[in-house]
Amino acid sequence: MDFIIQNFNEFLTFTGFANASAGNLIMILVGALFIWLAIKKDFEPLLLVPIGLGIILGNIPFRADAGLEIGLYEDYSVLNIFYQGVKQGWYPPLVFLGIGAMTDFSALISNPKLILIGAAAQFGIFGAYMVALALGFEPNQAAGIAITGGADGPTAIFLSSKLSPNLMGAIAVCAYSYMALVPVIQPPLMRLLTTKKERVIKMKPARQVSQTEKILFPIIGLLLTTFIVPSGLPLLGMLFFGNLLKESGKTTRLAKTASSSLNDIVVILLGLTVGCSTQASEFLTLNTIKIFALGALAFIIASASGILFVKLMNLFLPKGKKLNPLIGNAGVSAVPMSARISNNLGLEYDRHNFLLMHAMGPNVAGVIGSAVAAGALLGFFN
């Protein structure tokens, strides 16, 4: 009997009840909140459901010295093997492959000046970088935090895994949170920075883009961007490769796989492992609060920069060629959420003013811009 009691008591020390902390319970509630927002409020469910469940999974308490090989940071555990894709930077380029295979760059090709809006939105990244330095973060940490201004989760993970791996969980959750909150953050800012007259500007329909142009774009884009920032090659190379698969007309099956099955698998593993990395002991710190505050600042600056840059461009454009400033918010790389916001807000003020295709130009330019910015920061600090 004593043997049974002793073994039962030993068993109890392995349970989550015996090892739980207040931090674990708080993070489990955070994970549940993410899942609730995804399912009930439809806030990017494809991202927030895996991340939310990952947060819960990563904060299930267990005895660390038991050698069970179940924790994210325990060598040879299943979660640790999955996590290598985040830690070593494998998942983000594969996500970019899928994005490239899904994306139609016609809006940007037909109106190349829209790429300037995507470039202007990157001011949010460099503005947040300066503020992060002022708050006492190391330069490499500040760079990893600042990239959240692009609202681009894969880019944020890729850069932070190289420059600030100790902050990667908080940075990744921050980036994906602001991607999900695009419909909440951007519309009030767009109304604040534009007049009613500007919101009803009608833009001319984009010209038809030839198949030859669509094929040449990823090749020329790859050469131009990677010659400027070779360190962005893993992201930019896969983005343009995916787009070439889509546009070549001869690799449809590969493009479908990259944009559907492969992309879905990578997003599942990426979201789950990023969520698991937010363990209470590392996540519930003052630095996390600073990161979320800086992420919000970076995202607001990026969105505002795009809108204000369109207003600046309009000062030099002839009357019939002016741009609607509502497409300026789409300069961030939250594709296609920001472009949808531009379109929806435009329809509020003129139900015949469809801005979606116009907004997709700066939106896809923002994807390229954030990858270039990440490459520049990575090259600078390496």
Where are these regions (language model features)?
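N-terminal alpha-helical transmembrane segments of multi-pass membrane transport
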Residues: M1-E74
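Structural signature of hydrophobic alpha-helical transmembrane segments
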Residues: G16-M27, N80-V95, Q141-G149, Y176, ...
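Alpha-helical membrane segments and immediately flanking helix-loop junctions
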Residues: Q88-G89, F96-M102, I117-G127, V131, ...
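Entry/N-cap segments of selected transmembrane alpha helices
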Residues: A107-Y129, S281-I307, A359-N363
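Alpha-helical transmembrane segments
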Residues: N166-V184, F292-A302, L326-I327
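Membrane-embedded hairpin module used as a gating/binding unit in multi-pass transport
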Residues: S177-K250
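Transmembrane helical segments that form the transport core of multi-pass membrane transport proteins
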Residues: T225-V310
